[in-house]
Design a protein with these regions (language model features):
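Flavin-dependent oxidoreductase catalytic cores
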Residues: 1-364
């Protein structure tokens, strides 16, 4: 248990423990402005001793980035709301990274803020051989890279402790990573290392503007919401080709998204995706996926009303073995903002179990 509550330094910031709040979409910021309820939501988790808050996805400042209503953004009128959130979280002793998000292929025509703007993807694909979006031109690619960079500069200026790029689950950066949605024949497509270039350019250009001391994380996944069986890398060797360009570009930490953290990534080893990522990259990694629960999030969509809490002994054993460095907790923190504190004090019988109503309260 001690390893879970041992401080860790990411770049130049020290986190009080190894627990992050996983980013979870909320859709509770009308006109993209996070209000008092959003501040209270994050402050409660920070007061409950979460070491690092990773916010819900925040839209990149371009109309093609939006895929859902009432998602926060970084327009000027949102500045005050973000500053209030940052102050509230930091006053509780926690750190906070916003997750910078472009939905890519998940955007449907007719959505706000401009119904005429389609979804943007590398090759106009939402899935392998399924056309459903605008195929980005070279000019589109350049423009969106600059949109990401401008937002990262603003994120630092607002006072956040770092930033996470959402490169997982079938959204735009992941659309570039995955060969199923990236069939480009220019420098942004092709072999696995070339498919990282979009993300690498964002990171490299941001580094030139913000310096080396501001933490940049990237979340990635093998699975996609379009295809749960999809993989970016089928072997450790392919994973290395994927990771190392991102390391060289200036990433500080990898957030490796699994649906179930205990599942091994490749045959012949018990290491999960975060474990392999740490072994290959040498950088700190965050694991995630049904922490503290007995089943993954898919049950929510299948009508599952409740999920039984699960022991975290295996998680602690893996952390003790230094398989990964941090743990992101999602649904368990929705149901119980004091989950971290109760775990630290070994008050397991007082943890509030997750029920679907907690997800509904977050979404609606």
């Amino acid at each position: 248990m001690k390893s879970l509550f041992k401080p860790i330094t990411i770049n130049k910031i020290e986190l009080p423990n190894r627990i992050a709040m996983a980013p979870m979409t909320r859709m509770m910021s009308p006109e993209g402005i996070p209000g008092e309820n959003v501040k209270e939501y994050y402050q409660r988790r920070a007061a409950g001793e979460v070491g690092l808050i990773i916010t819900e996805g925040v839209e990149v400042s371009h109309p093609s980035s939006s895929g859902y209503p009432n998602v926060p953004g970084f327009q000027d009128k949102a500045d005050e709301g973000w500053k209030n959130i940052i102050d509230a979280v930091q006053s509780e002793g926690s750190k906070i990274f916003p997750q910078l998000w472009h939905v890519g292929a998940m955007r449907k025509e007719g959505m706000a803020p401009d119904p005429k703007v389609p979804g943007y993807t590398p090759s106009g694909l939402v899935n392998t051989n399924k056309e459903a979006a605008h195929a980005m031109t070279a000019e589109d690619v350049e423009m969106l890279i600059e949109c990401f960079v401008k937002d990262i500069i603003k994120i630092k200026d607002l006072g956040f402790d770092g930033v996470e790029l959402h490169g997982a689950h079938g959204y735009l950066i992941d659309n570039f990573f995955w060969e199923g949605t990236n069939q480009r024949d220019d420098n942004y497509g092709g072999e696995i290392d070339k498919r990282t270039r979009f993300a690498c350019e964002i990171i490299r250009r941001a580094r030139k503007k913000i310096g080396r001391d501001f933490p940049i994380a990237i979340r990635f996944s093998q699975w996609k919401q379009q295809d749960y069986e999809a993989k970016i890398a089928h072997t450790p060797e392919e994973l290395e080709k994927f990771l190392m360009p991102l390391v060289e570009a200036g990433v500080d930490v990898f957030h490796a998204s699994n649906r179930r953290y205990w599942e091994p990534e490749f045959e012949g080893s018990n290491l999960n995706l975060a474990g392999w990522t740490k072994k290959i990259s040498g950088l700190p990694t965050i694991t995630v996926g049904s922490v503290g629960l007995k089943s993954d999030f898919i049950g929510l969509y299948a009508g599952e009303d409740a999920v039984e809490s699960a022991p975290i002994d295996e998680l602690i054993n893996r952390l003790d073995a230094e398989e990964f460095d941090m743990v992101a907790v999602g649904r368990a923190l929705l149901s119980d903002p004091e989950w971290v504190k109760k775990v630290r004090e070994e008050r397991y019988d007082e943890i509030i179990p997750f029920e679907s109503k907690f997800a509904q309260s977050v979404y609606y």
